Amino acid sequence: MDNYLFNFCKNLETVWCKNQVDRIGIQTFGVTPMERLCVNAKNIDISAFAGMESLKEIHFRGGVEHMSLGAFAMLPSIETICLEGIDPDVMEDDWANLGNSNLTILVPEDTSDEQLEAIGRKFLSSMIITDGAQVKRGTCSMPEDPMPDIAEMLSAYGI
């Protein structure tokens, strides 16, 4: 997904991708009204989600090879970031200055203590969270969204 692909799309509520994408570029989802987002991408660029003022939860599926922590800048409503099997070594420290004491970072139950601490250090050093205890083991609760009925959507436009 190229840089600025959905940037400032004020009516964007849902994005559905069947398979993993190679990249989510700079401000791909910037300033959109989505409240929840599920990401399945290999690379996540800086400011990928910047300015999503309504975003409350974001879920990252496994397979992330590079993630700029600057992707989380300017997310005032964020409550949950779920990391499903992401190695802390693929996270690039970047200044996000979110400093959100109400944010929970969820990692899988089988995450080792060392990985848990490493993830906490990364999010702390990028000033996304205020306390390493905000990184917790748990289960993500975002269900899989079913594929939309494309024919039904097109019929609304007479196609």
Which positions does each model-derived feature cover?
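Terminal, low-complexity interaction segments
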Residues: 114-123
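Structural signature of tandem-repeat unit edges
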Residues: 3, 8-23, 32-45, 53-66, ...
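Small/polar residue-rich beta-strand/coil "junction" motifs that cap repeat-based extracellular fibers
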Residues: 94-96
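Short, low-complexity, Pro/Ser/Thr/Gly-rich segments in the mature regions of secreted, periplasmic
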Residues: 151-158
